[in-house]
Amino acid sequence: MLCRRATLPLLAVVAVGAAALVASCSGDDTTIGSPAPSTVDTGSIPGDSVPGDSVPPVLDVTAGEAFPAARCEANRTAGTITYLSSYDFAASASIIDVLVADSKGYYDALCLDVNITPSFSTENYPLIAANDAQFSSGGSFSEMVDFAGANDAGFVALAVEGRTGIDALITKDGEVPTLADVKGKKIGVKGAITPSVKAMLAKEGLVEGIDYETVNVEGFDPLAHIEIPDIIGFPGFKSNEPKQLEAAGIPFKLYDPSDFGIPGSFGVLYTNLTFLAEHPTAAQDFMRATMRGLADAVADPAAAAQVAVDVLNASGNALFLSPEGETARWAVESKLVSETATPDAPLGLPLVDDLTIEVTEYAEIGLFEGVPPLIETMVDASVLDGVYDDTGTVIWPAD
């Protein structure tokens, strides 16, 4: 049973700072840093739109009403918010929604100064851990959890847009008749093997570094990677590399982890505990604007893909991504993202039970050193819970 009103262990401490800011903006003698109660009982205050959350009711956003001036000031205090994409400006979940939101002025409308920077998922984790950037796009929840351990970092997933795995193992035609034939071979990877593929192989008794090797491949061109003689294949996104190979008429065999009973996720938007604690309204409103961008992108996939293509071209398109490829990519991903959304589980809302199953099953077959990670501090569904109304619509102030 899904419970959207989650408890808030991560943000219990930030209500004090937010309450102080409200007082300072309202002319009260209290200023930021003044003594204040250690807790704020918002659950008992009439009119609180999200009882029990970390934001005092006076800062709540109400649909169709003016954006609170004190909240605007709090958001401006956050300064420039840097978002790092996970694959240049591709038309992909947790990237395209940010691009659409920016193109429509949604961040500006909520008093947010957002700097959108192209990058690659595995390069971003240390930067988010150090708070050198505040938001990023992760390949999957398990990828984020894995890097959290590697970086000893306080990552927090605020949205998980894809509730199934997006990655698969793409192998050369005729070279891998069954998964067992991966044994003793090399797989090309971009930084690291993707979690779902690693879990799929582990379930078949194939362990990285023992039964097969992984080697880094340069660039992002599957047409070049499929020709590398020393590897039998490489992980890729079902919405990307297979489409390019099919368009080029190159045969291949795809192993989809979901066909082997492997749970997964994709399109993760995450931040760090430091930023979330210091700037709770800015963090929530970044997600509010982004989820509105996601709703627009799902409603009109072709128009959203064109936004991504325009941004790619304006920034030099370093990966030479094609308009046709990006349109095809988002056509696949938008369907995967939207088909699991309901009023109780709207677009992007992290489903903690499902994520727990994901990391637990991965641990049982050897990932995370065989120990299921504790994810309570690594995901916070309450942030998006406060962004959506009971119909699953983003709560948006008057223009």
Placement of each model-derived feature along the sequence:
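C-terminal motif of bacterial Sec signal peptides marking the signal peptidase cleavage site
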Residues: 20-24
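Conserved C-terminal helix/tail region of periplasmic/extracytoplasmic solute-binding proteins
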Residues: 55-58, 352-399
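Pocket-lining segment of extracytoplasmic ligand-binding domains
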Residues: 222-223, 227-319
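Bacterial lipoprotein signal-peptidase II cleavage site
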Residues: 25-35
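Short, glycine-/small- and polar/acidic-enriched structural segments
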Residues: 40, 45, 52-232, 236, ...
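Secondary-structure end/capping motifs
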Residues: 279-368
